Amino acid sequence: MRSLYLSFSLTIIFVLVIMHAEAKAISEPNAIAEADPGIFSALKTLGKILLPVILPTVAEKIKEKVG
């Protein structure tokens, strides 16, 4: 159960970071051209780390609830 909370927390953080990047791009038209490449590499790294952790955990919890 703790791992499920952790995976959901990390997912929420990941979504908030993406929303922040999108809001910055909308508010500043040239933001994508001038964007700090660090945030995009951080997003890629987060995605590579989170997806393999979250998907199996969520699938396992769903199987426990269903079956």
Swiss-Prot record:
Function: Toxin that causes a rapid and irreversible paralysis when intrathoracically injected into insects (blowflies). Does not cause spontaneous nocifensive behaviors by intraplantar injection in mice. Exhibits hemolytic and cytotoxic activities on HEK293 cells.
Subcellular compartments: Secreted
Protein name per its UniProtKB record: Myrmicitoxin(1)-Pm6a
Propeptide, residue positions: 26-37
One GO cellular component term noted in the UniProt record for this chain: extracellular region
GO MF annotations, alphabetized: toxin activity
Keyword Secreted annotated: yes
Organism: Pogonomyrmex maricopa (Maricopa harvester ant)
Top-level taxon of the source organism: Eukaryota
Residues recorded with modification Valine amide: 66
